[in-house]
Amino acid sequence: MRTLATIALSFAAGVFAAVLLGVGVWQLWAAGACLLAGLVLLGLKRTMPARLRLRGMLILFALCGALVYTALFQALVQAPVTARCGQMGEFSGTVLSRPVETEWGVRVTIRLSGSAAKAEVYADAEYAGLEPGQQLSGTAQWQDGARIRENDVTAFTSRGVFALLYARGPLTAEEGSAGSIRWLPQRAVYALREKIAAIWPDGDTAVFVTAELTGDRSGMAEEDAAVMTQAGVAHLFAVSGLHCAFLVSLLGLLLPVRRRALGAGLSMAVLLFYMVMVGLTPSVVRACIMQIFLLAAPLLRRESDGLTSLSAALLVILLANPFAAAGVSLQLSFAATLGLVCFSQRLSGFFKGLYRGKKRPVRAVVSFVAANLSASLAAMVFTIPLTACYFNTFSLIAPLSNLLILPAAGWSFMLAFVVTLAGFLWLPAARVLGWGVWALVRYVLWMASALTRLPGHALYFSNRYLKYWLVYAYALFTACAITGERRRKYAVAAALAAMTLLLTVGLNVRLSRCGEMNAMAVNVGQGQCTLLYAGDQAVVVDCGSSNSYVDAGSRAADQLESMGIHRLRAVAVTHYHADHTNGLYQLLARLEVQTLYLPDIEDEYGVRERLLRLAEKNGIEVVYVRRTVECPLGGAVLSLYPPVGEGDLNEQGLTALCSAGDFDVLITGDMAGSTERKLVGQYDLPDIEVLMVGHHGSRYSSSQELLQAVRPETAIISVGDNSYGHPTQEAMDRLSQAGAEIYRTDRQGNILVTVHGGD
């Protein structure tokens, strides 16, 4: 079976190289070189050991095949779609799933007619009733799914989506194959979700169970999602090996089939159905294929090999879509499983060996703890660099979280599955049984919340020194692995890693708190978030982004917690637009906040009401700024001015002025020049050192009147990927003419200004 692993892993290496380095002519040259080298090995029959020669040929020919296959896939599947992008054109395709509600309507995934490529159609809300199998056609603006506004994007192509279609005019929906048995798995998952909602009327439990059984956590409360992520157990909602193992165990309990072959066949069929039902994500495809290998091995009188089944699953996924190699979910799923295959048994043996007694109850507890800890630590070996790169996080509490939460999560998964199936037979009985699931869900969320309240439960790579520590730690343990077998060296390595980690964290906290006052513009893309802090006291003014791929709340919270700040003196909201507020829900879920300052204006988006509900839930004082309010901040003072303009939300926002001695920072939100003129006419603003430029550098903001009144020395523009032309040349010219030195978050990243001695 290791022959299959050699071929599959070599093929995967070729695909990863082609996708991550960029598809191009170099692939064909590299494929030719691999082919030539393989043919050379083929001729070395007498001068090279047969096994080594065969292994080398398999690797080289598989690499050649991968490079050629990826080039052909790009030319035959992606390129024809890309050629139509950037223009208006007709489309037609088969609906693959029910539409998903968006801010402006719905989004629906289709498979384009006559192609293996998928596309996402953005249309009006009237198309929310589309069903899988229907034929959808119309006219749309075609957008390349791999490149958006000069930025390379992998989120779509890794799912096989190569075009984004923005509907123009009415669409035509025909019956197609909707209702046929082909779409039974999709109908099953919709029925499952509806039954879950009927069994558990309280939204929190229903959303948790839906996420656990199907991987769909779109309706989960921000605070619940935050604590699960921070506790390191968010993988419970990525349908994977854990779920498939639970499902097979459940089938063994519900279907006590005596004949092994029949039982294995039924389990395989259910796994395949479940795989299609939850959406063919990389994690569930990998898990199901590995489970099928595990079930089939005894029937074929072979031993199951974890590396072979893992590599076979990777081969299947990459054959279906080579661009899946760039997907974060695939990389995390396979990295975690590779760690389990390589290290879990060794770690388990090590932990079990720590207890040499013979008492059965104690040995049982030791075995349980060893199995859970070894699995958690092994899964983290290769995933820590990935989570650091993609999510900026290193969860220290994850091994303990998995030990305390996974057993309950396993029981809740199996019980929820049984209860949901029972709900199709008799709903009242299912609701009674559902209380057991409710209790398990409450325990999981409570435990996750309790663990995230522990100091140092996670580290964030906003600490710029942490990446160097990570390289050091990996080098340290790698050196241990390639030297002799003495266990003591691992204890020494662990002690050194722990001590240097404490130094790394302490150094960042100390350096970040120097100065009388600090102002940081956090890079949140096209949005705004300003951190103002002095010592251990901090205020956040606005937190949001209009870029869907930017989690403004996480970025701000990561930055604050990496500086040792876990409690906010206040949060101030200039106005209620999403690019200034949609990160606040995550921020309020993760950090304790004393006071929330809001403008006393109504908004049409429901942001104010949602913030009020969160404030009430978390015990946060709410203050409406109807007159000038001063908020002490260590050695500085934050002054908040009430709205002075009229019209839309931009003109009815608050103004913030933070002063430390003679050093002043002014934040005007998104107000336009007409409102800026009212501001300087109504309030005696001082000459300022730093201006957080209004409206991301819009030509309508940063008026001459404002700049002449406050005479900023430094101008910081919070801006990112946008279609408005921000920052505009007109605004940049006015700032330059006013003598301000300009900084931009899209170019410099986070921008920090530190005040020493108030001057």
Where are the language model's segments positioned?
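N-terminal leader/targeting segments
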Residues: M1-T82, R286
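Core dinuclear metal-dependent hydrolase active-site scaffold
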Residues: R217, L318-A326, S449-A570, E616-V690, ...
